[in-house]
């Protein structure tokens, strides 16, 4: 370990590591409840391209887990496996196991639509439907057969409040959602995802296209939501991973190099590859 990581306030990528020294008891994976488990997992885009190699990972319940690593390392591919978004790729196949609360996500009898209700996803670019703000949030509920206006009203308000958006849109719920700012659209998409009460929320670089103020609101929202949901976030932003996550996984060339509580991984990584990445030597 170089001298930089032994300073009282070591820095990685220009980041003050005191950001992640929260003054709380160090997290220990053995004390956590497992939500998602990955066992000897391989993913192939086709017969010639293997994107994930022998991944073993436990993601704890109601914590924020960040996936970091250089572009092309497999972090978004792994994220999309959790709700089988990669099923849409012709020729893709998997080996190994991926479990959600001990149930095999890739089991023969799994209803993929139900899985995607349980495991919601928010993408890098906000994708509101060309409908009203209200109907964006109510959409998933209507698909599930909810018709009661009273129930819909209640869930829409609750979801928008949870997404820290209610006060900004409560007087214009009938307006088209595409008229919202980028940051508001992303929070609306999160509200839409949590309206159907998923167990897990997957966030694929949710703030990368947003301005700093909108990014901060998304990060604050992630922190608030982890009391109710297991959250997995892919990010290229090292500072963001440090600020919002409890655990961090570093990936490189399709392999999981290191996983641990965020404070330890950033300040005292076990693997040289991890240290090289977080200190900016490559990536």
Swiss-Prot record:
Q: Reaction catalysed? A: phosphate(out) + ATP + H2O = ADP + 2 phosphate(in) + H(+)
Under the heading SUPFAM superfamilies, the entry gives: P-loop containing nucleoside triphosphate hydrolases
Bilayer disposition of the protein:
Peripheral membrane protein
Nucleotidyltransferase recorded as keyword: no
Which terms under GO biological process does the entry name? phosphate ion transmembrane transport
Keyword tags: ATP-binding, Cell inner membrane, Cell membrane, Membrane, Nucleotide-binding, Phosphate transport, Translocase, Transport
Superkingdom of this entry's organism?
Bacteria
Q: Which GO terms describe its molecular function?
A: ATP binding; ATP hydrolysis activity; ATPase-coupled phosphate ion transmembrane transporter activity
Q: What is its main location?
A: membrane
**Which residues does the annotation say bind ATP?**
69-76
Q: Where in the cell is it found?
A: Cell inner membrane
Provide the Gene Ontology terms for cellular component: plasma membrane
Task: Fetch the InterPro entries from UniProt.
Answer: AAA+_ATPase, ABC_transporter-like_ATP-bd, ABC_transporter-like_CS, P-loop_NTPase, PstB-like
Q: What is its EC number?
A: 7.3.2.1
Q: Where is the ABC transporter domain?
A: 36-278
EC main group: translocase
Function per UniProt: Part of the ABC transporter complex PstSACB involved in phosphate import. Responsible for energy coupling to the transport system.
Report the family membership.
Belongs to the ABC transporter superfamily. Phosphate importer (TC 3.A.1.7) family.
Describe its assembly. The complex is composed of two ATP-binding proteins (PstB), two transmembrane proteins (PstC and PstA) and a solute-binding protein (PstS).
Q: What is this protein called?
A: Phosphate import ATP-binding protein PstB 2
């Amino acid at each position: 370990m170089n001298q930089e990581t032994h300073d009282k306030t070591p820095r990685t990528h220009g980041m003050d590591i005191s950001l992640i020294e929260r003054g709380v008891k160090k997290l220990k994976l053995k004390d956590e409840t497992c939500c998602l488990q990955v066992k000897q997992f391989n993913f192939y885009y086709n017969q010639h391209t293997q994107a994930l190699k022998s991944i073993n990972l436990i993601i704890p319940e109601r914590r924020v887990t960040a996936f970091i690593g250089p572009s092309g390392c497999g972090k978004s591919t792994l994220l999309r496996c959790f709700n089988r978004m990669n099923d849409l790729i012709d020729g893709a196949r998997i080996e190994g196991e991926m479990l959600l609360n001990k149930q095999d996500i890739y089991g023969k009898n799994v209803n993929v639509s139900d899985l995607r209700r349980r495991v919601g996803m928010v993408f890098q670019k906000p994708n509101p439907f060309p409908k009203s703000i209200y109907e964006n949030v109510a959409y998933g509920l209507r698909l599930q057969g909810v018709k009661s206006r009273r129930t819909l009203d209640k869930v829409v308000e609750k979801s928008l409040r949870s997404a820290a958006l209610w006060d900004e849109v409560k007087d214009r719920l009938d307006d088209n959602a595409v008229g919202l700012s980028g940051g508001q659209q992303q929070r609306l998409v999160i509200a839409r995802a949590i309206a159907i009460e998923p167990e897990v929320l997957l966030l694929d670089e949710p703030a990368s296209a947003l301005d700093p103020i909108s990014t901060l609101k998304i990060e604050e929202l992630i922190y608030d939501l982890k009391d109710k949901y297991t959250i997995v976030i892919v990010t290229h932003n090292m500072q963001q991973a440090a600020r919002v996550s409890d655990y961090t996984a570093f990936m490189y060339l399709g392999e999981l190099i290191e996983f641990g509580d965020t404070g330890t991984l950033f300040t005292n990584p076990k693997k040289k590859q991890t240290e090289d990445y977080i200190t900016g030597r490559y990536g």
